[in-house]
Amino acid sequence: MSNIVIVGAQWGDEGKGKIADTLAEKADLVVRYQGGNNAGHTLVVNGKKTFLHLIPSGVLHQHTKCVIGHGVVLDPVALDEEITRLQAKGIAISAENLFVSESCTIITSYHKLLDAVRESNTSEKIGTTGKGIGPAYEDKVSRKGIKFKHLFDKDLLRSRLAISLAEKETLFRDLYKVEYPTLEQEFDKLFALGQKLKQYAADTFSIIDQAIAAGKNVVYEGAQGVLLDVDYGTYPFVTSSNTSVAGVYSGATTAGHGLDHVIGITKAYTTRVGEGPFPTELFDDVGKFIQHKGGEIGVTTGRIRRCGWLDLPLLKYSAKCSNLTSIALTKVDVLSDMDTLKVCIGYKYEGKEIYCAYPGIDLYKVEPILVEMEPFSIDETVTKDNMPAALKTYLKTIENHVGIPISSLAYGPSREQILFFEDYFKKG
């Protein structure tokens, strides 16, 4: 039995889905525990791409059960569309392999509208995906939320909708002056979706608990990345959930269950979507080269990702925030055959050098300490035997500065293009 957590160690888009899909081959459960359909995971199998937003990456493995935990905010429209799209591709999804927590907070049309009008009416852009994630979490915390199970009860759904709409109606009508669905329109849509999706509703807490007790392999699949964590991230340019390992306990299981591995998924360089500080961002042709070669366009938003050198002070900070046990380094192939290769090992900040970021640091004011690395060139298949010495040095530099080992290396889009240095499912 192994309990494995996959955490994004940067600003998201690190390749978590690829690693989760690979580990799902040996997993009994793959569990999403936070975020919503603002996540976007790309899986490449036999040259064919599959895009996932809500459904866990274990869905391509017939024996693996997929769980959406109670920490996820659930857009029933998006879930219904994703299930339909995947089934049309011949991917089996049923009540036998998809389990959605009855306690997931629901994203409504009101949340999505509020998300959009706020972003368009503020001078400080956050770069939200517009999926209604933040407003849904607001309702959850202020106890105005609608749970997945509420969609199955007409009277309860109508009363919860009335509570949710009460304040928003004033905002839409008087402050933002936008049209919005009536309570009855929203009720009809949500109740119909509830009847359609009810078959997937489950007590996921007990499913996970029983799987662990039975010695099953459980993989927890995070969304976004630690640097977008609402508490640990680059606030206010963050998401609205705990993207660190803490989200596993609040969104899926209990702290009583130990974790065997917490894997920090990290690109060999750094990217960011939307606004916010980015110390190693590249504005030259090198940045454009990485962007083009890496296909750095958001799956969820379609926005071009900002690109820069690997930032080790931030990676070390992420490792501490989530108690990472190792790093899975992805997209190494993007850096192959470059003329110039650099890595950030520290910052100059307020008259001194620092080598690990921290919550109070102003990343707009840091000067990255960049060191030149020897460029490397890799083949379509990378093994321990044919790995270039320059790449080995690059990996060792990361390990030495962050203080944890690199346990796997992804060097291409397909399942086969991963080199594992450690068996995550082997005890001891």
UniProtKB/Swiss-Prot annotation:
One GO cellular component term:
cytoplasm
Q: What is its main location?
A: cytoplasm
Q: Per its UniProt record, what SMART domains does this chain match?
A: Adenylsucc_synt
Tell me which UniProt keywords the record has, alphabetically.
Cytoplasm, GTP-binding, Ligase, Magnesium, Metal-binding, Nucleotide-binding, Purine biosynthesis
Q: Where does GTP bind?
A: 12-18, 40-42, 305, 331-333, 410-412
Query: What top-level branch of life does the organism fall under?
Result: Bacteria
PROSITE patterns on file: ADENYLOSUCCIN_SYN_1, ADENYLOSUCCIN_SYN_2
Protein residues bound to IMP: 13-16, 38-41, 129, 143, 224, 239, 303
* Reported cofactor(s): Mg(2+)
The active site of this protein is located at: 13, 41
Q: Which Pfam families match?
A: Adenylsucc_synt
How the cofactor is bound: the record states: Binds 1 Mg(2+) ion per subunit.
What biological process terms from GO does the record include?
'de novo' AMP biosynthetic process; IMP metabolic process
Q: Which residues does the annotation say bind Mg(2+)?
A: 13, 40
Known InterPro entries for this protein? Adenylosuccin_syn_GTP-bd, Adenylosuccin_syn_Lys_AS, Adenylosuccinate_synth_dom1, Adenylosuccinate_synth_dom2, Adenylosuccinate_synth_dom3, Adenylosuccinate_synthetase, P-loop_NTPase
Subcellular location field: Cytoplasm
Q: Which amino acids does the record list as binding substrate?
A: 299-305
Picking any one GO molecular function of the record gives: adenylosuccinate synthase activity
Functional pathway:
Purine metabolism; AMP biosynthesis via de novo pathway; AMP from IMP: step 1/2
Which Enzyme Commission number(s) are listed?
A: 6.3.4.4
The record's catalysed reaction(s) read: IMP + L-aspartate + GTP = N(6)-(1,2-dicarboxyethyl)-AMP + GDP + phosphate + 2 H(+)
* Subunit relationships: Homodimer.
Say which family it is in.
Belongs to the adenylosuccinate synthetase family.
Q: What is this protein called?
A: Adenylosuccinate synthetase
At the highest ranks, the source species' classification is: Bacteria, Pseudomonadati, Pseudomonadota, Gammaproteobacteria, Thiotrichales
